[in-house]
Amino acid sequence: MAASFGEKLLLEVHEEGLDELLHDLRATCKEKLPISRAHFGIAPVDELLQLFMPPQAGHYQPPIEQEHVSGQGNPTSPTAGHGPPHPVPPPSISRLYPVLEISSTSSAAGKSQIVYHLAALAILPSEFNGIPLGGFGSAVVFVDTDGRFDAERLRTVAREIIQSTLQTRGASSSLSHSIEATLLNSLQHVHVFRPQSSLALIATLQSLDTYLLDISRHVSANRPVHAIVIDSATAFFWQDKLQDEIARTEDIGRPAADIERERLKKESFYLADVYADLVAELKRLQHMFDCSVIYTTTSFNGRAIEKQPDFYGSYNILDTAFPNMPSFRSPLPPPWGLFPTLRLVVQREAVRPFSPSATVSEVQREAPMRQEIVMRAEFVGSVNGWGRENWPRKLLEELKRRDEGVFGFRVGRNGITFN
């Protein structure tokens, strides 16, 4: 009898580590704060993100209801017949943090410029000299797989955010020394990594928590991690694809059992496994640091926004509600297609080509106007509509009311302006 009673008591014991306890405590405190709709600080992106974000997770049933569900009314459940059940500790609270994909069908489409703007907002303080900046006062992990990270450009973008805010508020512009001090302090919280392959990228992500939790290696110990940025996630795709094809060629004629054993032990290269491991590591870090993930991709078989899909492309032709919406599958293997919360497509605003019948004088007359349009550096962003035939009707209606999810932005020498 005593042994049976002790066994029942043990079933009610919930064991967890200190890290899980602190994680749940922080998440619980955050849930009591007013809900902010500014995940990234860019109004059109945040508005679109709200449409695609699933309901907030982390709520759990009261102990009695939970016991009823878990026991399914079974009288043989551990606490049946022993009075009110003891409170069952809630499961680990899981808050939802967005994953943003920014893709294009060509280079120089504005992807990295948006990333710089997002990173600048993440590291800047929430206010400057008492004036709200819209910054998050956090740290950013920037994984530069393309080898093109430009710290000076990031500094310029961050400076423009401060100066444009001061100008809008009518504040004094003679604060250059304070602005530079703020920029210097903020840029210390951008942690740049430059892996040279997908396997190196996985290793970087696997050791990232060790680095971030070692307060002797950086000055961001008192700041939360706002986002992990990968620019770009497709940087190593073609070399990975070649390596995968070589590995599959070497497997010809070998016993299937040996091939599978090596795959399970990760002794051989598999493209699908590598990219699945990348997503798994990013999700692990998201759960650990409660941060967003932002990554860029370049689609290898997409089309420009203004062009219509054909029957032989990678476009979804089943839905005609948004005929001008760009729509192409993820260029990366599964599960990357389902990983992002919001998929954006960006491109430079196209300039209408000359008419085939235009004369030389007409071309010369229009040339200055066309050059002026090019110099404006105007870009357009939109929701990637791949799979929209499965989207809820309410979501489609909301997108229709929001110009089909299209927004404009201008990239200038000093920064980015969103329409």
Language-model region placement:
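N-terminal regions of ATP-driven nucleic-acid and macromolecular assemblies
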Residues: 1-419
